[in-house]
From Swiss-Prot:
Coiled-coil intervals: none
DNA-binding region (UniProt annotation): 6-25
GO MF, one annotated term: DNA-binding transcription factor activity
Protein name per its UniProtKB record: Uncharacterized HTH-type transcriptional regulator SCO4158
Organism, as annotated: Streptomyces coelicolor (strain ATCC BAA-471 / A3(2) / M145)
Organism phylogeny: Bacteria, Bacillati, Actinomycetota, Actinomycetes, Kitasatosporales
InterPro entries linked: HTH_LacI, LacI/GalR-like_sensor, Lambda_DNA-bd_dom_sf, Peripla_BP_I
Amino acid sequence: MAKVTRDDVARLAGTSTAVVSYVINNGPRPVAPATRERVLAAIKELGYRPDRVAQAMASRRTDLIGLIVPDARQPFFAEMAHAVEWAASERGKMVLVGNSDYVGEREVHYLRAFLGMRVSGLILVSHALNDNAAAEIDAWDARVVLLHERPEAIDDVAVVTDDLGGAQLAVRHLLEHGYAYVACMGGTAETPSVGDPVSDHVEGWRRAMKEAGLSTEGRLFEAPYNRYDAYRVGLELLSGPQRPPAIFCSTDDQAIGLLRAARELRIDVPGELAVAGFDDIKEADLADPPLTTVASDRSAMARSAVDLVLDDGLRVAGSRRERLKVFPSQLVVRQSCGCA
């Protein structure tokens, strides 16, 4: 059986091969709805399958989007990657995922690999690119969108949450319960970059405490973002002579580790210790007790990031407002804070 070609589709649809290409590639020129329907019907009838490799060579782009995350084992990043994958599929794209493990060299490794594969664009969920890597992005004329992390340069394109405001909501809520003060479990000095959301979470905690006339001195505790290290830090913190009455954790993963430490030490939550987190991962609702936390619309953020990375015009022009999309944070009240 002879291979079906684009010429065959054009003959059956009564149009040119160029128009068939416009339909298949969704551009660059518009096609009348009636003509589009004829082409799609011809493609279906003939069973035509476009040669994506040839298309990529001709256009110097593929149907791939590169996504680099710090650690896909962490629930927040896994859920964000899943949301990006769904958003990309809605646009006819596929996603390649790389894990940087918070190491700049690994991030650059995936960056170069994805650019070499002619991805349509890159979405970076946390970044630590050096000047050489930034120059390489420019040399490849790559589309790059930051997701979840605030940009360092004014011309960067980013999709973020109101991390600072969300943290303030959580800490204010804990203080409204009448606790003497709220401690904070932040990140570590080694991991944050300039736009790291956890830095905003800590700053939001500081501002809420200051508003209440409370000192933050000696009440910020470092812990890696994952539950396992947070559990170990929690055991030490909760076993100390000055156990905090309430703790705001910069991530839900930290909070889940802290809850495990409290349970092991037979500390009642929220009776003897109130806890709040940030991210509203799926496990937050299943925690014991269910975790009060801060949520954002990850699906909408992912769609926005995909739309931006595929937008040809935004790279050339666009206001600061168009380049920085800030999604609101919402307080999700459950039982770990002391609410019934």
